[in-house]
Amino acid sequence: MGNLISFMKEVAEGLRKSGNYGTAHVYRSSMNAIIAFNGSRNLSFKKVNQEFLKSFESYLRRKNCSWNTVSTYMRTLRAVYNRAVDRHIAPYVPHHFRYVYTGTRADRKRALDKEDMERLMKELPKRLCQENKELQRTRALFFLMFLLRGIPFVDLAYLKKHDMDGNTITYRRRKTGRLLTVTLVPEAMKLIKRYMNTDPASP
């Protein structure tokens, strides 16, 4: 039988090379959680039985992981396991993940209230002029992500100069491949000009 950790690392690297950075990150996070639980990188697929899965689930809950985080790790592990079965390096077990949680739950409210958002947007520009440069940059990037209609950080980080045309930015989502166009408000344009790489050789 093959080694789960080695195979998971191989899959994550393949995802990264194909540009699926978000998914690759999830695979690596799941892999690290499994290593922490197992205590070593030596873990054969044969040992990943239903008892192991249930124990891993209990471990994640003891670490205060939400049920949605548990589900993400389990679904990732299931996807890796199924790939390994297809490659004949893991044993096929019907309904192998039946007894662990792989659903979704609304554990808690994640959106800010309107009042909180208004206060944040009012105070944030002021603080950008009052704090150390590292914190200024962090707050500025958060503000910019909001102004760009909630652009994910990975997409913001991979923006190129040619993505901007006048007062619009057109970019392709790293996660879905979908092409999106966002109109730049003056505040967003100021932040982009402040933090963009001015090196002529930089894309």
Model-inferred region functions:
Residues L77, L141, V154-A157:
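Alpha-helix N-cap/helix-start motif at helix boundaries, enriched for small hydrophobics
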Residues Y27, Y73, M117, L135-R139:
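Short, leucine-enriched amphipathic alpha-helices that occur as contiguous helical runs
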Residues A33-A36, K46-K47, R62-H96, R149-I151:
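N-terminal DNA-binding recognition helix of tyrosine site-specific recombinases/integrases
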Residues K54-S55, A90-P125:
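Flexible interdomain linker/hinge and immediately adjacent N-terminus
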Residues Y158-P200:
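Conserved tyrosine-mediated DNA breakage-rejoining catalytic core shared by Y-recombinases
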Residues A24, A111, P125-F143:
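Conserved catalytic core of the tyrosine transesterase superfamily
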Residues R62, D86, K122-Q130, H162, ...:
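Conserved helix-loop functional segments at active or binding sites
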Residues M1-K63:
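Basic/aromatic-enriched alpha-helical hairpins
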